[in-house]
Swiss-Prot record:
Species whose genome carries this gene: Neisseria gonorrhoeae (strain ATCC 700825 / FA 1090)
GO MF: ATP binding; kinase activity; phosphotransferase activity, alcohol group as acceptor
Residues the entry annotates as binding ATP: G13, T14, S15, M16, D17, G18, A19, D20
Family classification: Belongs to the anhydro-N-acetylmuramic acid kinase family.
Protein name: Anhydro-N-acetylmuramic acid kinase
UniProt gene name: anmK
Length: 367
């Protein structure tokens, strides 16, 4: 009987707060469970350099390659800490799946750029490494995002009722899992990204811990209405978005400068919640259960806003109730995608991305 296999997934999302690594056990293409986690925060200097690369600037090619190497060293450190915590050696791991750090997402031009020096990562970890997951989907005409609906479908589908899985990272995205039909999903809009950027600009803090700042503000109805009028929200899915559309400078075009900073932050929380609620209402009107993962679940103000927007129509839960820690879900997805690559299983959620066909995602690098 063939032994089960261990995989590592590494994810660093649009919040740019650091890298998560998750250890996953598989039996071929069958999920058995997640067994460990490690997190390495980004140093402020690295985060600033990554944010600078979001905008057009000088010597971008050189800067991107140097940052790819720096990120891969940080990813390797995170993987090493995970292995140490589990008393494992690199030879115990079948493959490592690494998403990389998104710095540009332009599906309308057929590309999405995630920084990672994958051959270097394979060399440093001494683990077969799979990465560049989005390019194959884009080549098949897809958005290259979101990639997690197929993973959510494999783990979280219920044969009796439609479930929605909400991931609140920098960008928020949903996976809709109808019984007896293919999963689909899309980016609903900003998740934590605008709230984080506003907090960094006005309090010099990386994020609003526990929603403490937002809790001191009041919702500004006129500002909220203007933000909700953005044409992205009325576009049909499949669709995806990022900092290119919803950056701090976009928000500032709607401000007159006299707003209370706490009120703006409070409004941004409701903005995220309302866009999620509107998206679910249009795409999954029959859903009664929503399972939440990602960093946003730790913000009680945002969670209260979601509960108020949905009312009694949809009950809100953590993915922990489905046996996967909400902070582990995205990294675990890339371990699962690495297992799909190894086992030659298409892992692309083409109904979510709009690709013309299911694809085996990623490229592999031996050490």
């Amino acid at each position: 009987m063939m032994e089960t296999q261990l995989y590592i997934g590494i994810m660093s999302g649009t919040s740019m707060d650091g890298a998560d690594a998750v250890l996953v056990r598989m039996d071929g293409g069958k999920w058995l469970g997640a067994e460990g986690h490690a997190f390495t925060p980004y140093p402020d200097r690295l985060r600033r350099k990554l944010l600078d690369l979001q905008d057009t600037g000088t010597d971008e090619l050189h800067r991107s390659r140097m940052l790819s190497q720096e990120l891969s060293r940080l990813y390797a450190q995170t993987a090493a800490e995970l292995l140490c915590s589990q008393n494992l050696a690199p030879c115990d791991i079948t493959a490592l799946g690494c998403h990389g750090q998104t710095v540009r997402h332009a599906p309308e031009h057929g590309y999405s750029i995630q920084l990672a020096d994958l051959p270097l990562l394979a060399e440093l970890t001494r683990i077969f490494t799979v990465g560049d997951f989005r390019s194959r989907d884009l080549a098949a005409g897809g958005q290259g995002a979101p990639l997690v609906p197929a993973f959510h479908e494999a783990l979280f589908r219920d044969d009796r009722e439609t479930r929605v899985v909400l991931n609140i990272g920098g960008i928020a995205n949903i996976s809709v899992l109808p019984p007896g039909a293919p999963a689909f999903g899309f980016d609903t809009g900003p998740g934590n990204m605008l709230m984080d950027a506003w907090t960094q600009a006005h309090w010099q803090l990386p994020y609003d811990k526990n929603g403490a700042k937002a809790a001191q503000g009041n919702i500004l109805p006129q500002l909220l209405g203007r933000l909700l009028a953005h044409p992205y929200f009325s576009q049909p899915h499949p669709k995806s978005t990022g900092r290119e559309l919803f950056a701090l400078n976009w928000l500032e075009t709607y401000l007159d400068g006299g707003e209370n900073r706490y009120d703006v932050l409070r409004t941004l929380s409701r903005f995220t919640a309302q866009t999620v609620c509107d998206a679910v209402s249009h795409a999954a009107a029959d859903a009664r259960q929503m399972y939440i993962c990602g960093g946003g679940i730790r913000n009680p103000v945002l969670m209260a806003d979601l509960a108020e927007c949905f009312g009694t129509r949809v009950s809100l839960h953590s993915t922990a109730e489905l046996n996967l820690d909400p902070q582990w879900v995205e990294a675990a997805a890339f371990a699962w995608l690495a297992a799909c690559w190894i086992n030659r299983i298409p892992g692309s959620p083409h109904k979510a991305t709009g690709a013309s066909k299911p694809c085996i995602l990623g490229a592999g690098y031996y050490y």
